[in-house]
């Protein structure tokens, strides 16, 4: 961040495209730190990593597995806590920025689906996430399993939506940026 501050806006960061998690998370970091950075969007992490390695961009946010596979060194983690793959790397919270941006997914259903069906899918998801092969697969991807039942996931989803809306609106991110 000190390099970005010293560059006065001439500090380039890569992302996997406008509105992507790396884009939004880095915008949030720049705003939290009060620094100007220039967004360089790419069509995926392969292009962004090449740009980083060439020195065209100075930072890029991605998942631990991608960093490890490309021999990249993280300087901060956008997670609640440190990750096992890089235990020496502090979270942004530890560095004074209350920023948690993680890749997550869920299962959605159209409005009006019978509650009994939702309950069956919810139970099946909870059970699937306890299967040893599934746990091992997520572990190999350095992806923690965080199960939320339907009500918890709905509340989490609303909170994430508001968090993203705030960053997107404050930064003026529009489709195609």
Feature map (PLM): residue ranges:
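C-terminal lobe and pocket-closing loops
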Residues: 65-130, 162
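Phosphate-coordinating loops and pocket residues in cytosolic domains that bind phosphorylated ligands
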Residues: 2, 54, 94, 139-140, ...
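Hinge/capping helix and adjacent helix->loop/strand transition within the periplasmic-binding protein
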Residues: 1-47, 102-137
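Short helices/loops that flank or line small-molecule/ion binding pockets
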Residues: 27-28, 32, 46-58, 65-71, ...
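A local structural motif
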Residues: 9-12, 31-51, 56-57, 142, ...
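Short gly/ser/thr-rich secondary-structure transition/capping motifs
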Residues: 55-60, 90-92
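Short beta-strand and adjacent tight-turn residues that come in two discontinuous sequence segments
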Residues: 42, 61-62, 77, 148
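An extracytoplasmic/periplasmic, membrane-proximal ligand-sensing/linker region
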Residues: 32-35, 115-177
